[in-house]
């Protein structure tokens, strides 16, 4: 059962029990989908709000997945396959993924999380403004801009992020008439 992934002691949803120190927006996607398709929650507001309260935010955006204490993973504590690792703030090592982040915030909004609308608006703005030479959507945004090579070449179109339009409709922040 989905609710069983909430750890009361830690105060957040556990995405993978093998790595309980890992917090990710992915754990909130089923909650978002339930609001989208059925207009009702699966989780309690406490579960959603406490999970979102653990999410770090810097310059208007947050990492997709992060270590509960250190934000970034190390080779010793990573929740990835043995041969996979990325530098701090890159890709799955605390990179920021707009679609998952916004869907998580929408779940929070539906549960009355006070920071939701601001976080959604900030994240949308950061997607376009963080890299002035690339004012378009990216697969992910690096969370540590000091890392050499943190900006991967972009395809200039990242269609998964179009899903954010649907998420904004679920949030009541846009209407299909705006298309």
What are these regions (language model features)?
Residues 20-21, 60, 74:
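Short, surface-exposed beta-strand/loop "edge" segments at domain boundaries and coil↔beta transitions
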Residues 1-5:
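Internal, well-ordered domain-core segments that constitute the primary functional module
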Residues 58-64:
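Active-site rim segments in enzyme catalytic domains, especially the processed small/beta chain
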Residues 64-89, 93-97:
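Generic long, charged, amphipathic alpha-helical segments
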